[in-house]
A protein has these predicted regions:
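Short, flexible loop/turn elements at secondary-structure junctions
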Residues: 16, 81, 134-138
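C-terminal outer-membrane beta-barrel translocator/porin domains of Gram-negative envelope proteins
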Residues: 41, 45, 51, 98-99, ...
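Outer-membrane beta-barrel initiation region
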Residues: 1-33, 102-124
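Structural signature of outer-membrane beta-barrel channels/translocons
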Residues: 2-3, 26-32, 64-74, 82, ...
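Short, glycine/acidic-rich beta->alpha junctions
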Residues: 17-19, 57, 146-150
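Short amphipathic alpha-helical segments, especially helix-boundary/capping motifs
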Residues: 2, 83-88, 94-95, 106, ...
């Protein structure tokens, strides 16, 4: 019971070609009513654009606060920092002369969550879940790009027969800004 109110979680995903990898570590402090969580995440993705190979590195840091009003309702705030680097593989004279692209992003996300569901077993839920959220991301450099997203997600799972469940989902979102999402 020494770490009953504290959690340390880590994870990784390594691809077969060892080029696209992800690493994550999380620390949660749950000993007061206001829960705190810090998440560090690193992702490396190898991709091809035209005739050139790129490697994208993304380092993200999240600070998450959760305030439960009761067992079913909570308010969540997430502060985000993200630093992206795009590196072109040196295959010829042109690609060797290209400089790395670097972008910094800062963001905030506010969520209201209603969750009356109960997990019966892995991926089998019964009950209702509703989330309403708004998120703002701002690129920290000369371009001054930003993104605002607002949306909702509602899910309902009901028992049909024994362990059979009927799940229904309704969701939607809209985004605005100089750097909109492409669906």
């Amino acid at each position: 019971d020494l770490f009953e109110d504290y959690r340390i979680t880590g994870g990784f995903r390594i691809s077969f070609d060892l080029q696209s990898n992800e690493f994550m570590i999380s620390y949660e402090d749950l000993h007061k009513r206001l829960d705190h969580q810090v998440v560090a995440y690193r992702q490396g993705i190898k991709s091809m654009v035209g005739d050139y190979y790129y490697k994208q590195y993304a380092n993200s840091l999240f600070y998450i606060m959760k305030y439960p009003f009761n067992k079913l309702n909570s308010l969540r705030l997430t502060l985000t920092g993200r630093y992206e680097t795009y590196v072109m593989a040196g295959l010829n004279d042109y690609s060797l002369k290209q400089k790395d692209e670097r972008h910094g992003w800062a963001g905030v996300k506010l969520e209201y969550v209603f969750d009356s569901s109960k997990e019966l077993c892995t991926n089998l839920w019964r009950g209702s879940k509703v989330k309403v959220f708004a998120e703002y991301q701002h690129r920290i450099d000369k371009d001054n790009k930003y993104l605002f997203v607002a949306g909702f997600d509602a899910r309902k799972s009901v028992k049909v027969f024994r362990n059979m469940t009927w799940a229904t989902r309704l969701s939607g979102s809209a985004n605005f800004g100089t750097s909109p999402l492409i669906y």
